[in-house]
């Protein structure tokens, strides 16, 4: 089996190192192709206005001067002599829950794999400074081993969030839907050394709605959250309402 690993934290991130350590012996071929630097929050951006370059870092580890989606696109688009059987993106340091998945480069790398017809997993440890990355990696290995024996279809993309807990303290696995964040991202104004105004987009301070069955609720209760994702973001419930609204314009 040929497994492609990517992420948005960069090829040398702690999460990637932990994942490589456990996955090396689990597959016949393991390749890392990830951004050369941290690309958190870039979502599904593709680089279309300049060429991409690839650097090699030892055995089967490659970096790209582009986005997470670029990395997967390059990896499966002909850079290697074969295409992967699966794409895993992660381990991200920080949660990718609820509607925040729209911003996530981690989820986008997995989405790109899914878009190109490969089963894909997006993996996140919910802590920004995790203490239990090795435990998280072991849980990923457990899930991967199960998926390997019970293959995913090419239409599958799973967003997996794991509490930052010792493996023995994880309560189990919940299949969840995306929850909702209360969006409050303050704009922080600063003055740089050249006395110019500059701005930081602050972290979301609004919290979340931990409705039962949501990914937020599962994490809050100490479970691994697994949410199947898809591309179609059509608001089906509004189709008829919008048609009716536009009748006078026809």
From Swiss-Prot:
SUPFAM superfamilies: SurE-like. It is found in: Cytoplasm. It comes from Dichelobacter nodosus (strain VCS1703A). Nucleotidase that shows phosphatase activity on nucleoside 5'-monophosphates. The keyword Cytoplasm applies. It comes from the Bacteria. A divalent metal cation binds at residues 8-9, 40, 92. This is 5'-nucleotidase SurE. Its cofactor is a divalent metal cation. It holds the Pfam family SurE. It catalyses: a ribonucleoside 5'-phosphate + H2O = a ribonucleoside + phosphate. Its EC number is 3.1.3.5. Belongs to the SurE nucleotidase family. Keywords: Cytoplasm, Hydrolase, Metal-binding, Nucleotide-binding. InterPro entries: SurE (IPR030048), SurE-like_Pase/nucleotidase (IPR002828), SurE-like_sf (IPR036523). Its main location: cytoplasm. HAMAP family: SurE.
